[in-house]
């Protein structure tokens, strides 16, 4: 029997469909692995970050497909291990672990007594040969990805955070508040709050980046390129100019390396990058900065400005 659902948004319709699909099963043994994952995603939507939900939906659609129609009552560790082994041939260890994590969390909602005994691929320790900050700056200069790249490498912003900045998020004295992210899910742009409580943070924009940003209407976005366009243009530009492969997210790693080289204390490194935890940092959602934080910002700005001295 086919049943369609109509709701105010696609997200609400998907929740109703998942809820109906689970309720119509008379016995727990009729619930499949796919049903359980759909139910888990619907249950967590609005609680977990939009990027996490998008990742879950991608896993549901493309990974561990041989398990999706298996009733939970018939699921065995042998089946799970076989599916994981097959995925390990084409996916990275991290991707396999993410898929397994979604599987275990979903099954636990409906069969809390099921014990997984899966052997997962060993974690990979990759040492990437990335371009230097100077090479990156020279490569993107004058391109449509210069501003996104500088925001990511200089201020340690994620792609979704770069795309979520609006002019009203920047005060007259140049303080940027990271409030929202923009993520494309199922072909639709969704504006959501930042990934975690500590992703919501404030940064002092250096004059160079303020000049790149310019002026605009309060509700206008500073960066209007799609995530896929930014990613493709950046990767292709870096490869063409430096001969090295680098993802946009690698810019955050470059930023972390810069802070490490400059001896920036972990407290301020995590604060700038949105990695902080309650045990290391108080709430930073305010318009004042400690003297130590200001000194840290100036130290990083001075280092980055050094790459532009030939202009």
Where are these regions (language model features)?
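Short, aromatic/basic-rich helix-turn unit that serves as a nucleic-acid recognition element
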Residues: 2-5, 33-61, 87-91
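C-terminal secondary-structure termini that scaffold catalytic or DNA-interacting sites
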Residues: 184-202, 207-209, 215, 298-311
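N-terminal DNA-binding recognition helix of tyrosine site-specific recombinases/integrases
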Residues: 70-119, 158-160
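Short, charged phosphate-coordinating catalytic segments
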Residues: 109-114, 150-180, 267
């Amino acid at each position: 029997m086919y049943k369609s659902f109509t709701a105010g948004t696609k997200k609400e319709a998907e929740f109703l469909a998942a809820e109906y699909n689970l309720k119509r099963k008379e016995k727990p043994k009729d619930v499949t692995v796919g049903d359980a994952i759909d139910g888990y995603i619907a249950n967590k939507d609005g609680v977990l970050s939009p990027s996490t939900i998008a990742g879950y939906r991608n896993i549901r659609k493309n990974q561990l497909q041989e398990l999706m129609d298996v009733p939970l009552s018939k699921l065995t560790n042998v089946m799970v291990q076989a599916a994981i082994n097959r995925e390990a041939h084409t996916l990275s260890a991290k991707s396999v672990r993410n898929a397994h994590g979604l599987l275990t969390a979903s099954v636990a909602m409906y069969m809390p007594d099921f014990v997984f005994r899966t052997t997962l691929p060993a974690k990979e320790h990759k040492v990437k040969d990335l371009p230097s900050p100077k090479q990156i700056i020279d490569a993107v200069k004058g391109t449509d990805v210069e501003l996104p790249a500088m925001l990511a490498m200089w201020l340690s912003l994620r792609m979704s955070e770069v795309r979520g900045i609006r002019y009203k998020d920047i005060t007259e004295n140049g303080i940027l508040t990271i409030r929202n992210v923009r993520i494309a899910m199922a072909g639709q742009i969704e504006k959501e709050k930042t990934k975690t409580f500590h992703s919501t943070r404030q940064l002092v924009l250096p004059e160079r980046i303020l000049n790149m940003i310019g002026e605009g209407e309060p509700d206008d976005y500073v960066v209007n390129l799609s995530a896929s366009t930014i990613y493709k243009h950046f990767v292709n530009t870096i490869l063409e100019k430096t001969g090295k492969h680098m993802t946009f997210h690698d810019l955050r790693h470059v930023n972390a390396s810069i802070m490490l080289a400059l001896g920036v204390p972990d407290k301020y490194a995590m604060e700038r990058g949105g990695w902080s935890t309650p045990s290391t940092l108080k709430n930073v959602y305010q318009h004042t900065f400690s003297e130590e934080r200001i000194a840290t910002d100036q130290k990083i700005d001075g280092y980055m400005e050094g790459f532009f001295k030939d202009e």
